[in-house]
Amino acid sequence: MNGSMPRHHAARVEAAIASGQAARSALVASWRRSSRLHHLDPGGRTSPMRLTEAELHQARERIAPLLAAAQGAMDRLYQAVGASGCCVLLADGEGVPVDRRGTAADDATFQSWGLWTGALWSEEHEGTNGIGTCLVEQRPLTIDRDQHFFTRNTLLSCTAVPIYDHEAALAGVLDVSSCRADRTDAFSSLIALATGEAAKRIEADLFRRAFSHARIVLTQGADGQCGGLIAVDADDLVIGATRSARAALGIAPGRALQPVPAADLLGGDTARDHLAGGQRAVVQ
């Protein structure tokens, strides 16, 4: 990185913020939060802060169900992207990676960039970045190279997808990061697709574990595609629904789900069809 690069990037960030583009650009809005709300300097050179081993252990314990549910999906995602110089990170709701997958030969590089367990990747600490900005905006996104707030992070490309728990609350983020200069737009699109599918598998497994005593039934969205999962007890009461199921059924994501007859929620014939085939509809 040449000497003019830090000054150029910092000037570009400040110019975009000053121009008022934050109202039209989610990226500039994130830059503005980083600068004005969190008082960060895009030219800052301090490496990411890290938790102590004891603090990291506590963070892992707090999201133990998510960690357990994520293992298989993280393994499969890493098998798909690891050979291309990417690492896979699972971060908690505070933006702290609590688990990762990576090639041993790349460990030193990723550690030096802070793409490691225990690092603090919230927007408050690291400005615009995949994990932190995903947590704020609660949507899948990619922060590519100079879209990062800090100049020192502009060699990174990070794709992040939010993960919601069995109560439809934001639980963490699944992230695939790379510091390779040859990452193409086409490859980034494939990574985004693979990461999104892995996040869905984690959510489904987390939901099944939380409602292991219930039937887990697929719902249909308005487009005929899978709308999410609901948990139905022995009395045919819906006692749980994933975030996507709530959206498909018109249930506010922030509202506590009270037990409701499946027939009332799904509709008469639809409910009977779903419940009659409940065991067939269970996600394996």
Model-flagged regions — what are they?
Residues T103-D106, F110, A245-L257:
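PAS/PAS-like sensory domain cap-loop motif
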Residues D146-Q147, L155-A160, D264-Q284:
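PAS-family sensory/regulatory modules and their coupling/dimerization elements
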Residues M1-H125, N129-F150, L155-S157, Y164-H166, ...:
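Intrinsically disordered, low-complexity terminal regulatory regions
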Residues D146, L257-Q258:
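Proline- and acidic/polar-enriched loop/turn elements at helix boundaries
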